């Protein structure tokens, strides 16, 4: 149903369509249009030179009569800019961004009557007040107890620090490590070079780290062995830009892990094996606590996503679904090592999962920004700097470049703010849930 909002300078008529598509007519007052007209004339004056006048000093009426096309073009741009901003300041369906404008046109342009500008654009979702009273999280589970078996597994992992790694010529067997490179190429293009998906990646031939199908391909093979596969799935061919996968075994490595004793424990800054076990237990308990907190965080995300429904912008949703679908199909083909036939059977299920994941992710994106704003949450300078350092390490490694451009710095700031906005909003949801759980119902 059409709606109208206005102030002394602008009026905005809005009509909404599914998918957060909005049609708007912005009416610009004569006063605003005349002010913008003066700005346009001033700019044109600075760009031209007229005989008998110093640059920028020609009378307005002379400029308007001699350069009407230039003035009208400049004025049109200024009017469109002001009308666009009015969509947010006067209207209540803010565009996602300038790029979200599908079309715009000036339908009236008169210094006596004002201007009219029509827009079609994608807007931020309209989200109602959150019904916090309906927020519900599962009862929090205690962190996992650390068993003696966990300690032994931890010692085995520590033992890898002292392990002897020997390249062998014999065929690979259970427990070995293998170094693999994976390339993709086009079978029907002799001139095309292969592209690396990964190089010299290490895998352990074990049930814990490989799917059965993947492990089976690389048991009983030697260094230099190649596994060549043809991709028949059109989606995977499109994603990888090729139809042939070549796995090359660079090395088969036998690993011998010694038993950890007091001497080796002292090399790890522990007083004895018992002291190392005690320190390991503390570390594993911290990891278990972190895992518990992450699970609770995920439960809060799930609860928030279910708290309220609203329409999502069509283009953002389609883009996110496409991205997640790609990730899921590639993961199934290259990591879980599904055959093309198995992938075809699972494809509809994976696409459905991608649609659900994309919908949830976008809902949480908009909901967390709403919570951050509504609840007046804040980000300290120290928090922002810490998160910028995290983002920088993820992007550049431990040694970021000395000279970072302003654009790159701005990207790091935005990434850090987005992460902190999201995490602080979810933490607020957790506090709300705890408060509701501790408040007796009437």
Swiss-Prot record:
One Pfam family matching this protein: Trigger_C
First-tier enzyme category under EC: isomerase
Cellular localization per UniProt: Cytoplasm
Swiss-Prot/TrEMBL keywords: Cell cycle, Cell division, Chaperone, Cytoplasm, Isomerase, Rotamase
Gene3D superfamilies associated with the record: 3.10.50.40, Trigger factor ribosome-binding domain, Trigger factor, C-terminal domain
Lineage top rank: taxon: Bacteria
A GO CC annotation given for this chain: cytoplasm
Transmembrane segments: none
Key word Cytoplasm present: yes
InterPro entries: PPIase_dom_sf, Trig_fac, Trigger_fac_C, Trigger_fac_C_sf, Trigger_fac_ribosome-bd_bac, Trigger_fac_ribosome-bd_sf, Trigger_fact/SurA_dom_sf
UniProt record, GO biological process: 'de novo' cotranslational protein folding; cell division; chaperone-mediated protein folding; protein transport; protein unfolding
GO MF annotations in UniProt: peptidyl-prolyl cis-trans isomerase activity; protein folding chaperone; ribosome binding
Its EC number(s): 5.2.1.8
Catalytic activity reported: [protein]-peptidylproline (omega=180) = [protein]-peptidylproline (omega=0)
Residues annotated as domain PPIase FKBP-type: 175-258
Keyword Isomerase part of the UniProt annotation: yes
Entry's family note: Belongs to the FKBP-type PPIase family. Tig subfamily.
Its job: Involved in protein export. Acts as a chaperone by maintaining the newly synthesized protein in an open conformation. Functions as a peptidyl-prolyl cis-trans isomerase.
Entry note about domains: Consists of 3 domains; the N-terminus binds the ribosome, the middle domain has PPIase activity, while the C-terminus has intrinsic chaperone activity on its own.
Name of the protein this chain belongs to: Trigger factor
Species in which this protein is naturally found: Chlamydia pneumoniae (Chlamydophila pneumoniae)
Lineage of producing organism: Bacteria, Pseudomonadati, Chlamydiota, Chlamydiia, Chlamydiales
